[in-house]
A protein has these predicted regions:
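RNA pseudouridine synthases
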Residues: 2-203
């Protein structure tokens, strides 16, 4: 049973569209923001585990300030699933490099070796949201599924760049058992606290 504090908080998932920041305010007028979504979020709502402007998919929003620490703390590993389109056909050797862990640069920490992860080739996902990048399907490319237990800033993009397969599309589909379901790009779903905590494996 969740505490009264948790019951008073609210929990949402958004299928974040391409070309939108994971925040409600920006000093630059040209950015699309979370406030542009056709949904009235309560005061104090913030995003957890942000996606960069050009990444898409599952974004958690909540008024619960404790969730960031509980979900993203380095000691609390949670599986994060992504589908990724990269340039060129990726070899099995390169896939294994990514699986084993690879050296990237982090802004605050410098050299960093990523933790072992799951990376596999997949078919083009069905029901992809439309983005005005039709040429992406015409260039030589590979679709991959990544399952990470860590979430460094722009980690997958940096990993792919190191092995010379630039990331062209990145969509987060699932965190633990919390997934997008049938949410279309730009749609929001509110979750009951009990369901939210159970699906993320949080107590």
């Amino acid at each position: 049973m969740q505490s009264l504090l948790h019951m008073e908080n609210r929990y949402f998932i958004l299928n974040k569209p391409y070309n939108m920041l994971s925040q409600f305010v920006s000093p630059y007028a040209h950015h699309r923001l979370l406030g542009d979504i056709d949904f009235q979020f309560p005061q104090g709502t913030h995003a957890i585990g942000r996606l960069d402007e050009f990444s898409e998919g599952l974004l958690i929003l909540t008024t619960d300030k404790s969730i960031t620490r509980r979900l993203l703390h380095p000691d609390k590993q949670h599986n994060r699933h992504y589908v990724v389109q990269v340039q060129r056909v990726m070899s099995e050797t390169t896939l294994q490099q990514l699986r084993d862990g690879i050296g990237i640069q982090l802004k605050q920490r410098g050299d960093y070796t990523t933790m072992p992860c799951e990376v596999n080739k997949i078919s083009r996902p069905e029901n992809l949201a439309f983005i005005d990048k039709a040429y992406l399907d015409r260039i030589e490319h590979t679709w991959l599924e990544f399952i990470l237990t860590e979430g460094k800033n722009r980690q997958i993009r940096k990993m792919c760049k190191v092995v010379k397969h630039n990331c062209k599309r990145l969509i987060r589909t699932k965190i633990e058992n919390l997934n997008l379901g049938d949410l279309k790009a730009g749609q929001v779903k509110e979750l009951k606290a009990e369901d939210f905590f159970n699906q993320l494996g949080l107590e």
